[in-house]
Amino acid sequence: MKKKAQPAKVSYFFGPGWNDLKTFIKKFWEFTQEDIKKRAEKVEKGKGVMSLSGAASLLSCFSLILFGSLFFLAIAFTVSLILGLIFLLVYLLFFLHWISDRIHLIRNKIFVACPSCKSKYFIPTYICPSCGARHSDLTPGKYGAFFRTCQCGKKLPAHFLLRRDRLEAECPNCGHSLSGTGNRPLCVPIIGGRSSGKTAFITAFSCEFIERVAPRNGMEIQHYNKENHDFYEKVLRSHYLHGTSMQSKEATDIKAASSVAFSFMVHHKKMKPDRLIQIYDIAGETFVNNTENELQLHYTYSEGIVFVLDPLSIPSIRNRLDEGISEVDKSSVGTLDVDLVLDSFLNKLRQITGHASGDALDIPIAVVISKADIRTVDEFIGDEKISAYLSQNGLDMNKYTAVEDRLCREFLTENGMAHFVNAIDMKFKNNRYFKCSAIGHSRERGRYNPKGVLEPMEWIFQTTDNGMKSIWHDSEFEKL
């Protein structure tokens, strides 16, 4: 496939150099022809070829034609060979620069994940800060090994060592503005039915991680862009402080993304490159009804999946609700069948990744039972239940999450969800169960007091990213 021409000046060694060689050979041949022509004219003006001097001039002319041509060929060949070897060496150096750039991207798992169309690229479209020209392949090559000269004369870095990622960039597919193009993305979709608690989970995790986990572990946070910063301050943080939540909205504009990403970058002096955390949220109705405006391509490169399961969507639990539950919480009971949500998700995974229906997937999945502060649920999987299990079996607190995992599985199995547990085990090689209360109390009763929202994400990061594991290891994820 032919590469698109770039708005830049071609390197001397990929065009102008060969043109100069052709010009040299042409001029040298013209000089040789001119010399032969002069000798021929001298023969014509002489005493004739029958005279001694005329015969000598004719012989000299033939000698010039023969030896001049041979000399021309020898010089042209020698110059072409020397320059060809020099150019070949330069091409090898250019190739090594390109290889080093690509190895850096692959080894560090650096790529561009567009939060809008979900497309994945090694290299985005970079924008010249001087003239706004768009460069879709800003890598070492025919336009330069380390720098590329834009059509406006501005020199642009074409290698990761020169911090190419500091340039403004956009998605080559949809034109969406991009940030953190030199970072390693950690993409985690949060899936679940309507009113399962996905958005509250995202709100609680984002605020807890940014304001508590990051400072405690020496991480520096940078928001993806101004839009994400404003969304965090005016929406997520506002809900966090007031104990409210919002429903994920179905995208009514067919040009708008159905799955919305909240993104921020994490920097730590011991972790290279920086991480770009992208948390995806999608409305339950859109997810189950298969009415997304875009292919959910991020499933192909996600670090893990968080499946939020509303225990109140389980009939046996819903029928045993304690009378103390508030009307607000009653109105937010998930109505979608958990098996239907799981089937929809698995169908999408097969459609996008091409996996056969019988294949077990490598991607880790954290099944999170939400609303665990409700008394009916707490009786099965609450802290007291876990502590009692630890005590009865002589286990220390390092086994807390392992016991949590076991009790959550037993809770679902005992309440008619054995088929769901079996399906997760069959379809996902690496799975773990958690409980959480994103708000920590009934909605609209004050600031969030979340419990259990950090552990699922920490487990995913520890499982897939040694860099994050080295700087964030608040919990132990052992097995019984």
Regions found by a protein language model. Give the residues of each.
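Short, flexible loop/turn elements at secondary-structure junctions
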Residues: 192-194, 266-270, 283-286, 369, ...
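Conserved G1/Walker A P-loop phosphate-binding module
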Residues: 101-149, 154-255, 267-277
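Catalytic micro-motifs at enzyme active sites that drive phosphoryl/nucleotidyl and oxygen chemistry
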Residues: 175-177, 248-254, 263-268, 291-296, ...
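Hydrophobic alpha-helical transmembrane segments of integral membrane proteins
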Residues: 55-96
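Short linear interaction motifs
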Residues: 94-96, 168-173, 181-187, 258-259, ...
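Conserved GTP-binding G-domain of TRAFAC-class P-loop NTPases and closely related GTPase folds
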Residues: 303-480
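Switch II of P-loop NTPase G domains
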Residues: 254-268, 272-306, 312-323, 448-451
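Basic, amphipathic N-terminal segments
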Residues: 1-58, 87-148, 154, 479-480
